[in-house]
Amino acid sequence: MITSKTSFLALIGNPVSHSLSPIMQNAAIQYLGLDLIYMAIPCKNEDLEIVVNSIKKMNCKGLNITIPFKQKVFDMCSEISPVAKKVKAINTLKLNDNKNWIGTNTDIDGFIYPLKNLNLIKKSSLILGSGGAARSVIQGLIELKLSKITIISRKRNSLNELITNFKNDIEIKGLLSTNNEIKNLIQETDLIINTTPVGMSNTTNTDELPFGQGFWDSINSKTIVYDLIYNPSPTPFLKFCDKKGCMTIDGTQMLIAQGAKSLSFWTNGLEVPYEVMHDALKEYL
């Protein structure tokens, strides 16, 4: 029951109307018996600083930050975790005793969750896309001790930036999507991760595969294919790879695991029920 003493958690982004976070977070909150409510707050770019700073003065226990603000909140934090600094993205904020924001990133934990029991040590990986999500993926692969990473993108500048940021941590290279090496790489790689929005619901390329279907003719049935998109589930890319005999993973587990890690962060280490969050999403969808 919501009372005058109920505290709140919120997701800040633009847009947020598609978000599933309130469904799974409120299910976990209810299960744990916490006097909290989680909601999504849309925010215009020009209003971000006003909104985030105003919330500090309310009965708020923490925030999730999503696109397009994961880098823009850095200047609003008095303390930032090492992992958030490394991937240059914050997705979770919590107020300290002085009512200042502490920023961290739980996307890495979320990304790792469905992979941690697959023994990927010394394996090779291919990342599709060089945007913000690729940073968390690279950091996660480093923590899983893979041997090398190749990033495929249409954008040379962002490729170079990622390589510069991570070249001291793992063997990493970037290729433009037109490179002739890619066909052989697709055939030989152990793990492929899609970080692009291609195939996502409510986009102009809902039915497409990253870089086009012909790009994937050489894919090997032994390859694990992981698409960070969770709506639709499965994506056209995962359907295609499943027909090729690949093991496939959608973004649902990452979504839940990063959310559980955020809720644990806000509640000072409370054990959060993954299955409760999963069941709530399954029922909703």
Curated annotation (Swiss-Prot):
Pathway: Metabolic intermediate biosynthesis; chorismate biosynthesis; chorismate from D-erythrose 4-phosphate and phosphoenolpyruvate: step 4/7. NADP(+) binds at residues 129-133, 228, 251. Disulfide bonds: none annotated. Coiled coil: none annotated. GO terms for cellular component: cytosol. GO terms for molecular function: NADP binding; shikimate 3-dehydrogenase (NADP+) activity. Belongs to the shikimate dehydrogenase family. This is Shikimate dehydrogenase (NADP(+)). The gene is aroE.
